[in-house]
């Protein structure tokens, strides 16, 4: 007998709607038969005037849209953010303006590299994208379950993602592609170590941290700005899967994380995360020992402690996965007054790329879809028409300035000014202190057992690579810590002997 809410979805529908509805065509006309096509005689050919069939099949042929190029498979939920601590001295954003204030939100969790049918338990970062429906527009905080990323310059992003996808000839995942890229971009080491540690296999979506990852700016009502990073920590605790359990679930329940989230919410066991920020002044940023806008590095908590802000509660499942999750579109460019961008190059690159991919996947009016529209503030602009447009903004003028009472600006939401100097050039940053924080991760974050498990996790896929890639990666590991390189080397040699 089915026990979980996800198993009983159809039964629940039947109990909720006991009276069957008359079946119609897409234009609302009732039909008398849904079990046979229209033919000339019992054994004769179909007729082109079978509009019931044509209506059904034409829509079926167009049901799928392009899947996301990354983060293709995911789960979503609705909820709210509640302010529990006053941070108005740092930020004027409407969402934070009063303790106790609640703001509705949508979150989408996801794996990164796999296709939409891949296993939820793959060793992969997890997407952690939140859309806050604030009274001054939608704020999208598009992060991951890691505080760092593989690269610091966005020009590498397409090539990095190519290595996480399939070989274009064999159509197979290729460890040589993956590790060869990391061999040439050692700034990835910090994130790679995070990925191959126990944290690379979170136990579903409810038991993992979330991070904005990038550095942002917060601005208060007096126009004073500071730099900030966002953190989310689950009150239900962090849990990870063992390699063996993750492999078992990939076979027996590849939708494990989606199922776990849906059933928990449906049972009333609402997941909760506390939000924290780290704060760095402009003066501290100028003097800090490394580039504070480098997304391959963290801000040490001892120097920049976590400041509690509020809590995020997920309390409602989507009614329609396609409409509310598959068609949801998150974009780092979507900020609100009080939140601004930093010089983080990866953030700057994402400002363009996310909107661009939404145009490809959903069309130029994706922002008009109910799940994406800023329904608590409403959009007022001169953007009109295009595929699937239905909002003409009360037939207002589509040009500005004008003499017809349409449109005014708000001087109080002016971006803060900042100085910018330097020669225009392409500045290579591949050798910018790539080993110090990975070394701290090895020495201070991982215990003895976690180090051993991480080395074992590396040895399997790295051992399948060409010898020069193995040697190059072990050299990188040894620069992090001699014991790290030696352990992985010994494990790979042991694997090789066992295959003789």
Curated annotation (Swiss-Prot):
Active site (catalytic residues): 71, 144
InterPro entries named among the record's database cross-references: Catalase (IPR018028), Catalase_3 (IPR040333), Catalase_AS (IPR024708), Catalase_clade1/3 (IPR024711), Catalase_core (IPR011614), Catalase_haem_BS (IPR002226), Catalase_immune_responsive (IPR010582), Catalase_sf (IPR020835)
Major place of residence: other
Coiled-coil intervals, chain numbering: none
Iron in keyword set: yes
GO molecular function: catalase activity; heme binding; metal ion binding; peroxidase activity
Location(s) in or outside the cell: Peroxisome
Keyword Heme tagged: yes
Binding-site residues, heme: 354
Gene3D superfamilies hit by this protein: Catalase core domain
GO terms under cellular component: cytoplasm; mitochondrion; peroxisome
pH dependence statement: Optimum pH is 6.
Highest taxon in the source lineage: Eukaryota
Cited Pfam families: Catalase, Catalase-rel
Induction remarks: Up-regulated in response to Cu(2+). Up-regulated in response to phoxim (an organophosphorus insecticide) and carbaryl (a carbamate insecticide).
UniProt keywords, alphabetically: Heme, Hydrogen peroxide, Iron, Metal-binding, Oxidoreductase, Peroxidase, Peroxisome
Record family assignment: Belongs to the catalase family.
Complex and partners: Homotetramer.
Name of this protein: Peroxisomal catalase 1
């Amino acid at each position: 007998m089915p026990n979980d809410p996800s198993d009983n979805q159809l039964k629940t529908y039947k109990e909720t709607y006991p009276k069957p509805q008359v079946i119609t065509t897409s234009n609302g006309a009732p039909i008398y038969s849904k079990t046979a096509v229209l033919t000339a005689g019992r054994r004769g050919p179909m007729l082109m005037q079978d509009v019931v069939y044509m209506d059904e099949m034409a829509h079926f042929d167009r049901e799928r849209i392009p899947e996301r190029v990354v983060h293709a498979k995911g789960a979503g939920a609705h909820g709210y953010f509640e302010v529990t601590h006053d941070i108005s001295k740092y930020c004027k954003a409407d969402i934070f303006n009063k303790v106790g204030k609640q703001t509705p939100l949508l979150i989408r969790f996801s794996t990164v590299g796999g296709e939409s049918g891949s296993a939820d338990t793959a060793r992969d970062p997890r997407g952690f994208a939140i859309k806050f429906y604030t009274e001054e527009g939608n704020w999208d905080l598009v992060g991951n379950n890691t505080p760092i990323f593989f690269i610091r310059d966005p020009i590498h992003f397409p090539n990095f993602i190519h290595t996480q996808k399939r070989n274009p000839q064999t159509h197979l995942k290729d460890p040589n592609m993956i590790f060869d890229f990391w061999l040439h971009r050692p700034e990835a080491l910090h994130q790679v170590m995070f990925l191959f540690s126990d944290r690379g296999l979170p136990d579903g979506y409810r038991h993992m941290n979330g991070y904005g990852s990038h550095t942002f700016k917060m601005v208060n009502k007096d126009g004073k700005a500071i730099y900030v990073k966002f953190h989310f920590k689950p009150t239900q605790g962090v849990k990870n899967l063992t390699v063996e359990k993750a492999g078992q679930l990939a076979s027996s329940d590849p939708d494990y994380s989606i199922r776990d989230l849906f059933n928990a919410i449906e049972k009333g066991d609402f997941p909760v995360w506390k939000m924290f920020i780290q704060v760095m002044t402009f003066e501290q940023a100028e003097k800090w020992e490394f580039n504070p806008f480098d997304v391959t590095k963290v801000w040490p908590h001892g120097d920049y402690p976590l400041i509690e802000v509020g809590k995020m509660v997920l309390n409602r499942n989507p009614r329609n996965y396609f409409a509310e999750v598959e068609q949801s579109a998150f974009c780092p460019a979507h900020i609100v007054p009080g939140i601004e961008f930093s010089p983080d190059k990866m953030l700057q690159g994402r400002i363009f790329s996310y909107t661009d991919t939404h145009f490809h996947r959903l069309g130029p009016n994706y922002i008009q879809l109910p799940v994406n529209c800023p329904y608590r503030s409403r959009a007022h602009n001169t953007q009109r028409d295009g595929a699937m447009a239905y909002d003409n903004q009360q037939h207002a003028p589509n040009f500005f300035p004008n003499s017809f009472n349409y449109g005014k600006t708000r001087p109080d939401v002016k971006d803060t000014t900042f100085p910018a100097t330097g020669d225009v050039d392409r500045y290579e940053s591949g050798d910018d202190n790539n080993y110090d924080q990975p070394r701290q991760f090895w020495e201070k974050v991982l215990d003895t057992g976690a180090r051993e498990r991480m080395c074992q996790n590396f040895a399997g896929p790295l051992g399948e690579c060409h010898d020069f890639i193995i040697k190059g990666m072990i050299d990188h590991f040894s620069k992090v810590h001699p014991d790290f390189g030696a352990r992985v080397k010994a494990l790979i040699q042991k694997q090789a002997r066992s295959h003789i």
